[in-house]
């Protein structure tokens, strides 16, 4: 990358440790949830390596030394290598660290405003992820029922909650048994994205699968969804907060069921798409999904061209 000034690597490197309370990257990361912290730390490490030809990471780079020519070069390099969504996420991390450097009086106002004056990369318009079909969901659940045992029963409960609750995997791993009201199907999300509280509802079918799981888990206080070893022994603790365990669980079930690859987040896309297809207004779906705006919810709509085709057919010619 000739346009990145690798000769400046030494100038951008911290020459002595900085207290975490005065390190812009550390201050920024401390404001995030555990799951977001891991993702953004990875982004900052990548940016630091890019700027210094691999010599620095997020904590050894002196972010206060960055100027517009550095950030503009980072944007160009990321745009060439990565998808627009990933690039923009990394640019958010870059801007936020520079903001903390400014707040900590490590960079003057003029240099700061120039350095963060980099625009997002425009997307291609192609939607990420997909919605699952009814047949695929049935195959996933059938795979669990046919296998039997504690792991399969737990997995069926996980799939039921993701499918009918439309929640994020990070929200799922934080659920306590007290968050679920089996009588009403209410599932309380105490701390969703952005620290938001909301209530979602499970269908009777989903409740039945969760009840089957609770019969072997027991009603002891603690994590609603727990790890189970190969011997069927249940450990009453939460999965890791980043939700990686749920990702692996879903991936394994998809392979066993012969279902084309999808992510846990695709259950949210399916949830939103199906509710919109049933005629629910976008604001109700937004509340259930815990989105900040209906515009975000609209991006989750995977009903495809058939929706538009049917809408036009309902028009009267005159």
PLM region spans:
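Conserved catalytic core of the tyrosine transesterase superfamily
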Residues: 1-318
């Amino acid at each position: 990358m000739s346009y990145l000034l690798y000769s400046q690597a030494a100038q951008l490197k911290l020459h002595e440790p900085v207290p975490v309370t005065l390190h812009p990257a550390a201050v920024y990361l401390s404001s995030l949830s555990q799951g977001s912290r891991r993702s953004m730390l990875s982004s900052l490490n990548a940016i630091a390596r890019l700027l210094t030809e691999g010599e620095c990471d997020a904590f050894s780079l002196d972010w206060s030394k960055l100027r517009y020519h550095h950030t503009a070069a980072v944007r160009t390099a990321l745009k060439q290598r990565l998808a627009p969504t990933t690039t923009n996420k990394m640019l958010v991390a870059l801007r936020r660290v520079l903001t903390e450097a400014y707040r900590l009086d490590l960079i003057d106002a003029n240099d700061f405003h120039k350095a963060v004056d980099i625009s997002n990369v425009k997307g291609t318009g192609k939607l990420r992820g997909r919605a699952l079909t009814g047949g695929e969901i049935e195959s996933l659940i059938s795979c669990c029922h046919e296998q039997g045992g504690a792991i399969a029963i737990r997995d069926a409960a996980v799939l039921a909650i993701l499918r009918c609750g439309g929640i994020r995997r990070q929200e799922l791993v934080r659920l306590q048994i007290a968050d679920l009201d089996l009588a009403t199907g209410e599932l309380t999300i105490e701390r969703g994205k952005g620290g938001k509280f909301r209530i979602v509802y499970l269908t009777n079918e989903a409740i039945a699968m969760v009840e089957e799981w609770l019969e072997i888990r027991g009603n002891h206080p603690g994590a609603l969804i727990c790890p189970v070893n190969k011997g069927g022994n249940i450990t009453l603790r939460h999965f890791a907060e980043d939700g990686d365990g749920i990702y692996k669980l879903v991936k394994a079930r998809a392979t066993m069921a012969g279902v084309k690859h999808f992510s846990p987040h695709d259950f949210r896309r399916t949830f939103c798409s199906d509710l919109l297809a049933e005629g629910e207004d976008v604001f109700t779906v937004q509340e259930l999904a815990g989105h900040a705006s209906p515009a975000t919810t609209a991006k989750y709509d995977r009903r495809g061209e058939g929706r538009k085709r049917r809408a036009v057919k309902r028009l009267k010619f005159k």
